[in-house]
Every structure is written in structure tokens, then in C-alpha cells.
Amino acid sequence: MAPNLLTIGLLLTLIASGQAHLNIFLNLHEVLRLIGVSAELYYVREGAINDYALNFAVPVPANISDVTFTWQSLVDHPLPYSINIATSDTEVLPRPILNISRIGDVPVEPQTWGIALKCSGTRNAEVTVTINVEVILDRATNNNTNLIFKRKKICLREEQDSAHEEYDDDDLDLLQTARKGHGGDIHYVDRNDEHVVANGHQAPEKQRPVVTESPVGRGNSGGSKRDFDPMLRENLVPPASGLVTLIVGGILALVLVSTLILIAYCAKGPSKRHPSNGVHLIKTSSFQRLPTISSTAHNSIYVCPSTITPTYATLTRPFREYEHEPEEFNRRLQELTVQKCRVRLSCLVQEGNFGRIYRGTYNDCQEVLVKTVAQHASQLQVNLLLQESMMLYEASHPNVLSVLGISIEDYATPFVLYAATGSVRNLKSFLQDPSYARSVTTIQTVLMGSQLAMAMEHLHNHGVIHKDIAARNCVIDDQLRVKLTDSALSRDLFPGDYNSLGDGEYRPIKWLSLEALQKSHYNEGSDVWSFGVLMWEMCTLGKLPYAEIDPYEMEHYLKDGYRLAQPFNCPDELFTIMAYCWASMPAERPSFSQLQICLSEFHTQITRYV
């Protein structure tokens, strides 16, 4: 009995030690100057996450221009990490600076690192700073910890005079001072640049015992910083005058009234400006101005009989956003895991800056396409490949190419497998290849569009919003059978199709609906809009939509009613179906089941004469 008890005790000890992998906390100095309490605040204590602490957005008063964290790996080796920082207002708080690399290792000795938060001084504001820290606990099992810390930085306009004079040296000195006594190299790295510009050494200090509360109060601490209590509203400097509030309110009221007038004008205007029921076009090279196309209009061009009716306003299906659910992501990853030794690469199909697509075989018998990354790819790029490749997980449909398996034995260069024969190739590359695409007829284009509409109806029925429907995210074989696939690696392989509007996020601006551009709202209707652009791509042999328009001007042009022009040799009936997809309101666009009916009826109509 005694040996059994000893064995159980050893097992429990091993389990406990396996869980105690990480400490992340605010040290005494940091808690005292931010909150005014002499204590250590733990976010992760011996592997256990403190959700209450993570949910609290710590206020950072105007007289404090940096924040610090302390961490330590409790296992016998450093733990890989990556850090991302975002601010809610880049004009007021433009450039947080880390004093460690964005990607590195959590050391086995306690280390304090910090972030400089220097306001621009342009106006009074409270800016939310989001700090995302991902720590890889075990590469073999893909065991990651993702932590999100929030800080509310108070920025005052009065800081404008000194903002540019003291920014570079003072912030770095503050961060360097914060790290002394906790050991480790001192690096100052820009948020967008991992080039090390300074390096120093400090002897490591032993880890202190946990302090839960100290009798030392703020009255004994002294100094202006410690007397400032950020939790007391009266200590915050109020805005300069109530006049600012009055002016802002007046401007908002004028904007609201103008918007209502504009909506009323647009709703009534077309019938007065265009007495004919036909579609009147104002062409400007590859785009044109289109009036609102009524779903009940009977014009001389083409109307799909009684099938174009508003549908999206009453939809109540929940849509899956698995990328915000780490448990679901890990479950999918475990189910799709395959052995890398069973995958053989035969030839390189497509190559980007870091992305690679190969042809190969799985188990020496099944032909596959393999998406992977080069050795120099960052951890964030690897994570994005894995997340986006599982977007169509378990989407079983003849016209959907979903992921077959994933190998993460070498987490730096994972393999993502798709079942595909040797004749399968990217649809955009196919359209731009003169030897293939010019032989495609209108009838075949309509059939290809019908296949993709069926694929999208299947995804929507299962609560999946694609968000990036385009020719680059489709494949086609030598029988002109097309399949919709995910957008993994598309930003790297087709960089000209993605643009950033100054927010650091690269999106397919020329394919997005108005609501997706304005508010990043993605829904069934936004997918329909992108499908219309995809049909235009197929008719123009893979041309870039809105090629003459600057990405920053896209929202303005779409709000003014401009849409893609009718391609050369595109029948009026087919272009009318596209135009329905580009209605300004999502509820006015057809569903994919309605699009299938329209394409099917048009196919029947044109085959009568063949």
C-alpha cells in the first residue's frame, strides 16, 4: 500500500509541476504608482490565470508615460513568446515602444519589461491600449497561452509642448530604470522594428516571495507620482472648457440631419432623375455610376422572375467566429493533425515573400496541395496560416476545397494539406493565362458562377461567412470544375489585391461591400457583394477591379453610387445579376439560392440558341 501511495504522490507532484509553467505579474513598484496599493498583482501565478485581473483595464494617468510587466518561466527552459500592441486612437497615442523584442523567449529568471506610452499632445483623450501576449508552453502539443492586457492611458493636450522634446531619451530611460534589479539584457525595440538599438547587462536577482498586501500606505510613500490616485476622478484634469462639448454636439447634430436628408433624397431621387425603367449608366473606364436597381422593376435588360427579394434583414442564424475561441481552434488542430513523414512534396506551384504552395502526395497515393511557409516566416504569420486554413473546416461540399490535414511537428514550418488532383490550379492564375482562359465561353462562365453560388449557399446554411470571396481564393481543374477555398497565404501570394487604410490591417478593399469598408461588418450580404466582383473577374479574365481608384477613395466612390462597369462581351443579363449583388443595403441584395435560380434561368435561356 505504501509504494502505491508513494507512486500516486509522485504523479501528483509531476502534474502540479507541469502546470506551474509561468508567472506574469505587476511588481510592487508598478502597482503602487498605478493603483496606489503596495502589493504584487498576478495575472498568471504558477500557470493559473487570474481572469478578474485580466478583465480590469488599468488606468494610466497623464503623468505616467510607461507601463511595465514582470514575468518568469517556471520550467527548466525559456518559453517562446510574441507580443502585439494596438491603440484605439493612433493620433493621440501614436507609437507605443517595447523595450524587448516583439518575438523572443520568457527567461527562467524574473525579468521586467516595459512599454513607452507617449501621447502626441494633440488633444485630451482616454486611449485604450491592448497588449496581446502569446506564450508557447509546449510546441509538441500546440499548448499556447494567449493573454490580453488592457490599459487606459489618459492623454492631455497640455503635453504637446514637451511631447516631441523628451520622447526619445526620457521614455527609454524610464523603461531602463524599471528593469534594473530584475536582470536580463536591456533592448529598446520599436513596435514595428525589431532592430536592437541598445544593450546592457544587469546581474539577475532571485525571485521575491509573493506579497499579497502591505501595511505601507500612500501617506508614507511621498512624491507627486504616488500622491496621484488614478481611481479618483477629481484628480484627472478636466477638458479646457464646456465649449468643446457644445461644438462637438452641434457638429454631430448637423451630420445626423444631413445624413437623413441624403437618405431621403437617394430614396426618392432615381424615379425623378431616371424616368425610364432601364438601367442608365455613366461610364468611367472600368467603373460606372449605377442607380438603385429595384427588385420589382421590369426593364428591357433582364430581371430574374420574382426571385430578387430582400432576405437578409430577418436572418437570425448564428454565425461561427471560431477564431475567437481558442478551445475550438485547438480541437480542430488536434483532429486534423497528420504525420509529416507521410507527406512528400513534388514541385513548387506558387511562391510569395514567405508563403509557399507545393504539389505533393499523402501516404504515397493521395494527390494534395500543400500550403506552408519559409523558415524566415514569423510566428504571427505561421499562426495566421493555421487559423485561416481552418476557416472551411468540415465544409463537405463538391465545390468547397477544405483542409484535409495539418502537420505541426515542426511548428515553424507547418504543412497544410488539401485534397487536389494534379490538374487543379488557382482560378486567378488560370484566368490570366492566355492559353487557357480565352477559350472559356459565356455558358461556361455562367456554370462556374453557379458552382460557386452553390458552395456559398452551403457555407451560409452552416453559419460560415467567408469574408474574402475572390478568384484568388478559388481553384479550377481541366474540366472547368471550380471550388471555393480559404484565404490562407493570399495576402502574401497576391499582395496587389490587399491594401491597408492606415490601420495596419491588409484587407481586399476592392472586393469589400460598403458596410465592410465602413464598419468592418461582414454578413451574408457582404459575401454576395464579393461574389458579384468575382463574377466580374471571370468575365474580364482576372483584371483588378477598380484599378484606377485609390484604396482610400473606395468608400467615397461606392457611397456616390459608382460600381464596376459592364465588361466587354458580357451579356446584359449576366451583368444585371452582378449589379443586384452591389446594392447599397445588404437586405436589398439577393441570397445565393436566388442567384442560383437567376444563373440557371439565364443558362437555360442562352443554351436554347446553341
From Swiss-Prot:
Q: Which gene encodes it?
A: drl
Q: Does the keyword Signal apply?
A: yes
Organism of origin is: Drosophila melanogaster
* BP-aspect Gene Ontology terms: axon guidance; axon midline choice point recognition; axonogenesis; canonical Wnt signaling pathway; cell surface receptor protein tyrosine kinase signaling pathway; chemorepulsion of axon; dendrite guidance; determination of muscle attachment site
Q: In which tissues is it expressed?
A: In the embryonic abdominal hemisegment, expression is restricted to cell body, axon and growth cone of a cluster of 20 ventral nerve cord interneurons. During muscle growth and attachment events in the embryonic abdominal hemisegment, expression is in somatic muscle fibers 21-23 at 10-13 hours and 2 patches of approximately 15 neighboring epidermal cells (dorsal and ventral attachment sites) at 6-13 hours.
> Mind telling me what this protein is named?
Tyrosine-protein kinase Drl
Q: Where is the Protein kinase domain?
A: 343-606
Q: What SUPFAM superfamilies does the record point to?
A: Protein kinase-like (PK-like)
Positions of the UniProt region annotated as Disordered: 202-230
Give the membrane topology, semicolon-separated if more than one: Single-pass membrane protein
Instruction: Name a GO molecular-function annotation.
Output: transferase activity
Q: Enumerate the subcellular locations listed in this protein's record, separating them with semicolons.
A: Cell membrane
Q: Where does ATP bind?
A: 349-357, 371
Which residue intervals are topologically Extracellular? 21-242
